């Protein structure tokens, strides 16, 4: 396919003349006849799901094509594909959501089928229809089913007509704000506002009273439009103690439909799942059978084939389940189902797309053991789980095995940008029963190493270790109801003292380990090598007892309350051990360190030996040091006091973030993002709690409110402007 042809296609597409593109693709010699099997798949997605689809395709001997934006040029999914095509700038609207551009990529590479993954175009009936009209195989359900189920209002009307129980609500076409507010009052507060299209919790708002309705409704519309291109909304009665249980269904083109049991996705933050499991705990076999049958009936009602998920909300007080929505795609959490049924669902998708019947009947679908999935995100947990951006300076996932999977789309050195979802990886584990699987989950979380961006790993460890989670007492408000256990409480002196004691122990381990590294580093530098990142202190006298002081600033990663300086005396003893002195009449700690790798150590203290790992990188004039041992992970930093070689510093992440102090009353950005809307003017009088501006990052909106009453001063931003985390937005003058 010549570049002249591509340009001609683009010209016609821009004139909204899609017919030429359809005719071109349909007539291409590379398009497969219907009786042939798929030989080349274009994956219209990015990140971990693109890598996961390609893995199965390659196992089946199918060639793969990746698409990428400028931000993803060097991403893992691009490297994993046989071919890759650039589709536009970083903005998802101009790249991964551009169906016509993706169709051009398919024509250019001779792909016979398109797998949409999840998100982006996966639930676009228009895109599925374009594939069908163009002679391409869309690896997913028919466009008609996506259309019926993609509109949540329409899907609820269909399910209601089919006798599936529904939560009371409004699913009509009238979207006038006054009409919607009137409907909300009829339903009765609290209510939940949901976009009629899309998923992932985007655009969802819980409204407790009428006074909050207008702001929530308009915010939901904006977020829905930004994420899905459609801003229509539905309203539902908000069930106060619900469980979120979904059923994996599968159909083929021969009329067969079955379910592969259920998943519990109740543990959520910001209306997004973070730990999923299969099967759901604490339900009866009768409940499971009824739920599965309801899901199959829902799929049959719309002539469904390929992979889909029917989501139900379960009232924990009555044990009644209600249809919530149907996701017409492969779900993020599909691996937990794969683990308990022993099947590759992407392979099923491809075979169904080829016209093959389902490989099993309902009675043949096995269920073995229990599986968990934990989603590892780049996010600031102390800041309300706000998404974070930055470089993965250190990335060491756990080792995979038949019972442990790591689904990821990143490598060490990659950047987590503001343009896409901040997920780093999915950790999936299997055990013979729920207890065994939970033990494995906690162990793997303890050994999953990420440094360079804040993550939710520590929070996931707390969730997995909670006594109520251990017995399966889960519901969607689990985090809110147990926040005193899950979040650090600075007002509890005993808990604070225990936490700080653990930090000081980690600091002692860091001091001993970096002293060990510095011995070898000094020897290397004496032979003409430039000091590495680890060298920051004078060398010890090797054959005599010597002492140095190491100062570490502790970044309080739990509470996000700043740094604490820890000063340690490190005494090198003739027998090769270290004596760590913390001062303040604290007892000394004797440590013996054996180097087990570049940054891995075996440390013995008081007859107890343990594995310790360190990672370090340069950022903002500091050496940042992370330590992992047992279930502990802490981070420290040291002011860099020597010059490093250009090569040494060149590979480290450097930012231009603001480090100077701000005038009193200055409000700074809680995250990097795009200013969507500025709601007031400079010098305007505002009340405490009044919304001032709206930020968007990773398609999620965050409203910045006035912390106190006063007048707005030094308003520095406008709509459409990008801001960095911690940059000044405005000032409140009382």
From Swiss-Prot:
Mn(2+) 1 binds at residues 311, 325. Keywords: ATP-binding, Biotin, Ligase, Manganese, Metal-binding, Mitochondrion, Nucleotide-binding, Phosphoprotein, Transit peptide. Its cofactor is biotin; Mn(2+). SUPFAM superfamilies: Glutathione synthetase ATP-binding domain-like, PreATP-grasp domain, Rudiment single hybrid motif, Single hybrid motif. Biotin-attachment subunit of the 3-methylcrotonyl-CoA carboxylase, an enzyme that catalyzes the conversion of 3-methylcrotonyl-CoA to 3-methylglutaconyl-CoA, a critical step for leucine and isovaleric acid catabolism. Probably a heterodimer composed of biotin-containing alpha subunits and beta subunits. NCBIfam families: PRK08591.1. PANTHER family: CARBOXYLASE:PYRUVATE/ACETYL-COA/PROPIONYL-COA CARBOXYLASE, METHYLCROTONOYL-COA CARBOXYLASE SUBUNIT ALPHA, MITOCHONDRIAL-RELATED. This is Methylcrotonoyl-CoA carboxylase subunit alpha, mitochondrial. The lineage of its organism: Eukaryota, Viridiplantae, Streptophyta, Embryophyta, Tracheophyta.
């Amino acid at each position: 396919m010549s570049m002249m042809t591509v340009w001609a296609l683009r010209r016609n597409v821009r004139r909204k003349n899609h017919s030429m593109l359809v005719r071109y693709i349909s007539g291409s010699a590379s398009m497969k006849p219907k009786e042939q099997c798929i030989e080349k798949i274009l994956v219209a997605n990015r990140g971990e799901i693109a890598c996961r689809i390609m893995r199965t395709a390659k196992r089946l001997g199918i060639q793969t094509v990746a698409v990428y934006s400028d931000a993803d040029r060097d991403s893992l999914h691009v490297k994993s594909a046989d071919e890759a095509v650039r589709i536009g700038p970083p903005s998802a609207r101009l790249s991964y959501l551009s169906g016509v551009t993706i169709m051009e990529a398919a024509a250019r590479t001779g792909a016979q089928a398109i797998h949409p993954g999840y998100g982006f175009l996966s639930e676009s009936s228009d895109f599925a229809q374009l594939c069908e009209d163009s002679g391409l195989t869309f690896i997913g359900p028919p466009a008609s089913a996506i259309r019926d189920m993609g509109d949540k209002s329409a899907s609820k009307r269909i399910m209601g007509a089919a006798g599936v129980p529904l939560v009371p609500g409004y699913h009509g076409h009238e979207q006038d704000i006054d009409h919607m507010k009137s409907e909300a009052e009829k339903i009765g507060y609290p209510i939940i506002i949901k976009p009629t299209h899309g998923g992932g919790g985007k655009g969802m708002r819980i409204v407790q009273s009428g006074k909050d309705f207008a702001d929530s409704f308009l915010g939901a519309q904006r977020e829905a439009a930004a994420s899905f291109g459609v801003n229509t909304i539905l309203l539902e009665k908000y069930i106060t103690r619900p469980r979120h249980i979904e059923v994996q269904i599968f159909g083929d083109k021969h009329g067969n439909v079955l379910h592969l049991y259920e998943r519990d996705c109740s543990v959520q933050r910001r209306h997004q799942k973070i730990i999923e499991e299969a099967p759901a705990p604490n339900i009866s076999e009768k409940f499971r059978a009824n739920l599965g049958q309801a899901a199959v009936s829902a799929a049959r009602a719309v002539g469904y084939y390929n992979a889909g998920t029917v989501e139900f909300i379960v009232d924990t007080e009555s044990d009644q389940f209600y249809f919530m929505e149907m996701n017409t795609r492969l779900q993020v959490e599909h691996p937990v189902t794969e683990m308990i049924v022993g099947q590759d669902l992407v392979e099923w998708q491809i075979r169904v797309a080829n016209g093959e019947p389902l490989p099993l009947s309902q009675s043949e679908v096995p269920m073995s053991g229990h599986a968990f999935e934990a989603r590892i995100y780049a996010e600031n947990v102390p800041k309300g789980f706000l998404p974070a951006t930055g470089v993965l300076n250190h990335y060491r996932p756990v080792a995979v095995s038949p019972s442990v999977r790591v689904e990821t789309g990143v490598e060490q050195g990659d950047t987590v940008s503001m343009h896409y979802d901040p997920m780093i990886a999915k950790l999936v584990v299997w055990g013979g029963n729920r207890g065994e699987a939970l033990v494995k989950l906690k162990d793997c979380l303890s050994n999953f190493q990420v440094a360079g961006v804040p993550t939710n790993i520590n929070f996931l460890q707390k969730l997995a270790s909670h006594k109520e989670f251990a017995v399966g007492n889960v519901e969607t408000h689990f985090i809110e109801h147990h926040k005193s256990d899950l979040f650090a409480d600075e007002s509890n002196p005993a808990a604070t003292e225990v936490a700080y004691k653990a930090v000081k122990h980690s600091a002692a381990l860091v001091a001993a380990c970096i002293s060990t590294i510095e011995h070898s580093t000094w020897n290397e530098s004496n032979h003409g090598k430039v000091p590495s990142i680890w060298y920051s202190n004078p060398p010890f006298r090797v054959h005599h007892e010597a002492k140095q002081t190491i100062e570490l600033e502790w970044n309080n990663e739990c509470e996000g309350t700043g740094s604490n300086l820890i000063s340690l005396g490190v005494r090198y003893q003739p027998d090769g051990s270290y004596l760590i002195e913390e001062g303040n009449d604290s007892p000394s700690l004797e440590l013996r360190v054996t180097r087990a790798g570049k940054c891995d150590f075996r440390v013995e203290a008081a007859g107890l030996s343990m594995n310790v790992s360190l990672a370090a990188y340069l950022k903002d004039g500091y050496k940042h040091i992370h330590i992992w041992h047992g279930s502990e992970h802490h981070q420290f930093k040291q002011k860099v006091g020597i010059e490093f070689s250009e090569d040494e510093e060149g590979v480290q992440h450097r930012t231009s973030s603001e480090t100077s102090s701000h005038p009193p009353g200055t409000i700074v950005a809680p995250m990097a993002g795009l200013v969507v809307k500025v709601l007031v003017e400079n010098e305007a009088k505002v009340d405490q709690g009044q919304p001032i501006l709206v930020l968007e990052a990773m398609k999620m909106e965050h409203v910045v409110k006035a912390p106190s009453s006063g007048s707005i001063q030094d308003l520095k931003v406008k709509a459409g402007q990008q801001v960095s985390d911690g940059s000044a937005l405005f000032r409140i003058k009382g």
